[in-house]
Regions:
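Substrate-binding cleft of secreted/luminal carbohydrate-active enzymes
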Residues: 204-218
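Short catalytic-loop micro-motif centered on adjacent basic/acidic residues
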Residues: 4, 84-90, 183-185
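Conserved, mostly hydrophobic/aromatic
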Residues: 6, 77, 87, 114, ...
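Substrate-binding/active-site clefts of carbohydrate-active enzymes
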Residues: 1-80, 101, 105-107, 124
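Carbohydrate-binding surface patches
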Residues: 258, 273-314
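Active-site-proximal helices and loops of the catalytic beta/alpha 8
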Residues: 11, 16-24, 72-75, 83-172, ...
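Amphipathic alpha-helical
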Residues: 253-267
Length: 319
């Protein structure tokens, strides 16, 4: 078992005592230098906010105080045995800031795994400039569900080609669901969700499973206050209270995760397309040293389904 903590080092709530202290003590104080505050605003000092959310105040990432704070917090928990950090909204902070943090954390915790939440842009450059280990592969996430939803596997083919390029410099964090997006079963249905999982588990990367997706949870993300509630439900008190239609999806997760573990070389495999149509693709994921491979066929012509074969052509799994 390995544990990552989620570090929200880009912003704090407006009620944070440090924000109140900063406004009271002024720009020359340590607290004043920690937060990103417009001290010259005509209406008086006004904190700058995160992505337009008036209740979220940004840290001043150009100042030493923010670097010191993040280093202190990260080391505090790494000293106590966690294995790494997920850096929330890492994309909203310049890579140079993360580099200053990482160069002080690495000597003390050389094996810590640092994952940055990055939505778009040059993933490889962000990793190189920040010094972190990996970022969230949103390009592949979008291509997986969109290609199934639109019956257009050319999009998946393009994304897999891009994915190969990223693997030359780092191993991305791959996923088909998380706490910020519409549930995969709501996007593509239960069968489509299992097909998406088959792709996730047969291409390179460090895959993540969002809780509830293994039970075909549904939920639509909405752009409003409380719009994340549907995709972040509480789990029932016991497994007996889970809906029965989640059982086959759970079984598919067990089988495909088992397949992934039996083929650990998939983490940095390279993928090539062998056959491509709008509704059918066959791709091959090969070990980096070329020693072995898996062939995966995705067929969307009727209900979405996937078939996985080993290098000899033997069927390992079929949806």
């Amino acid at each position: 078992l390995r544990i990552l903590l989620d570090g929200v080092f880009s912003h704090v709530g407006e009620g944070h005592p440090g924000v109140k202290q900063a406004l009271a003590e002024g720009p020359g104080s340590p607290a004043g230098r920690l937060f990103d505050i417009d001290w010259q605003h005509p209406g008086g000092p006004r904190p700058r906010v995160f992505e337009g959310h008036s209740s979220l105040v940004r840290l001043n990432h150009s100042g030493q105080e923010a670097v010191d704070l993040v280093v202190r917090v990260m080391n505090h928990w790494l000293d106590r045995g966690i294995d790494g950090w997920r850096l929330d909204a890492a994309y909203s902070v310049r890579p140079e800031f993360w580099s200053k943090v990482v160069e002080r954390v690495r000597p003390r915790h050389p094996n810590a795994w640092l994952l940055g939440e990055v939505l778009h842009g040059d993933y490889s450059a962000f990793v190189a400039e920040s010094g972190i280990d990996s970022v969230t592969q949103y390009e592949l996430w979008k291509a997986i569900w969109s290609s199934i939803n639109d019956r257009n596997l050319f999009e998946l083919d393009h994304a897999l080609s891009r994915h190969n390029q990223f693997l030359d410099s780092f191993i991305p964090n791959t996923f088909i669901g998380n706490h910020d997006v519409t549930r995969i079963a709501s996007r593509v249905g239960t069968d489509g969700a299992v097909t998406a999982l088959a792709v996730l588990m047969t291409v390179a990367g460090i895959p993540s499973i969002y809780y509830g997706d293994e039970q075909a949870f549904v939920g639509i993300k909405e752009d409003r206050l409380g719009g994340d509630d549907a995709i972040r439900p509480a789990l029932p008190d016991s497994p007996a209270e889970l809906a029965p239609w989640g059982r086959p999806v759970l079984r598919a997760h067990q089988e495909l995760i088992g397949l992934r573990r039996r083929h650990p070389w998939l983490v940095n495999a390279r993928t090539e397309t062998l056959h491509l149509e709008n509704q059918r693709i066959v791709y091959r994921s090969s070990a980096a040293d070329g020693s072995t491979s898996l062939d995966v066929e995705i067929d969307l012509s009727c209900s979405p389904n996937a078939t996985i074969r080993d290098a000899t052509g033997r069927e390992l799994w079929h949806q």
